[in-house]
Amino acid sequence: MGLKINRPRRGSMGVYPRKRAADIVPRVRTWPEVNLGKPALLGFAAYKAGMLHAVVVEDRPTSPLYGKEVVRPVTVLDAPPLFIWGFRLYTLDPTNGYRRSIAEVWAPELPAYIRRVLTLPEKADVDKQMKKVEEFKDVAVDVRALVATQPHLSGIGKKTPELLEIPIGGVPSVDERIKFAVSLLGKTVSPKEVFTAGQLVDVIAVTKGKGYQGVIKRFGVTILPRWHKHRKGHRRTGTIGPQAPALMFTQPRPGQMGFHQRTEYNKRVVKIGDNGAEITPKSGFLHYGVIRGPYILIQGTVPGAKKRLVVLRHPARPPKKAPPAAEPQVVWLSSQSI
């Protein structure tokens, strides 16, 4: 007898409940501990612009195509510099072990577009805030930068920024992280200061929304034969479960599909550039526009629709056999947007 294949559904229970994401800005729940030898941000945020295809030289020694030119699909991310408007110190709460904010410092001068999402004080007392940092730095376990995107520098014609919290890591010393955070106050950070071409990153974004869908599209359930014994329907399950319990979550049911936050691990950075004009098609990216500043090319696909915010971070689960750390050699890049 052959192998018995029983696959009544194709949906994972690990992503329940399948409901709409609470916010279109991704919420990162896990940040890795990396040793970079110097303090740095552990993540970056960019906007999805579209896709191109590139001809690159295969640099994995174990590949049969090693040293030859291969075609790779790449996702283009519009990556304007992030503005650092503050930082926070966290400690561990002794009662439950959760992180708790103990000090916060804001930059003395903030741009006008921050007022679109924050109510700013008339005058920020930085000296008073820094005294609190000095008081609690001995019990601090985490330092996180408060960053704002700059969509007015992107191609989407948007003015209201998104606010995120990105940890500062790379070194174990909290004092070094605090000094680095103070040096960044009121300044901008470009993608080249966070990532390098050739390395792996995790991409986190909210997927495309599909609305309310049936079990065929949502779970890939087999369509029933169209004959008289299936008169109650064809694009449905044979049964929705027993009378009791009344609802079984393992049973495929129609409902919301898409607009879920998802994480894809270990995507390779093909290239990081400063001039978006060199990769933008003549007519611009479809449904996006023109990239004017820094950009990031990611090998493969990235979750989400165009214009959606994508958060990149250092890999939380790096593979045992990582690709070469050197920048891939891009021979040719298409000029037609997908």
Swiss-Prot record:
Record note on quaternary structure: Part of the 50S ribosomal subunit. Forms a cluster with proteins L14 and L24e.
PROSITE patterns given in the database record: RIBOSOMAL_L3
Region listing for Disordered, in residue ranges: 230-253
One annotated GO biological process: translation
Statement: the UniProt record of this protein carries the keyword RNA-binding: yes
InterPro entries: L3_arc_euk, Ribosomal_L3_dom_3_arc_sf, Ribosomal_uL3, Ribosomal_uL3_arc, Ribosomal_uL3_CS, Transl_B-barrel_sf
Family matches, as SUPFAM superfamilies: Translation proteins
Keyword entries, A-Z: Ribonucleoprotein, Ribosomal protein, RNA-binding, rRNA-binding
Top-level division of the source organism's lineage: Archaea
One GO molecular-function entry: rRNA binding
Entry keyword annotation includes Ribosomal protein: yes
Organism whose genome encodes this protein: Pyrobaculum neutrophilum (strain DSM 2338 / JCM 9278 / NBRC 100436 / V24Sta)
GO cellular component, one term: cytosolic large ribosomal subunit
Entry protein name: Large ribosomal subunit protein uL3
Role of this protein: One of the primary rRNA binding proteins, it binds directly near the 3'-end of the 23S rRNA, where it nucleates assembly of the 50S subunit.
Family: Belongs to the universal ribosomal protein uL3 family.
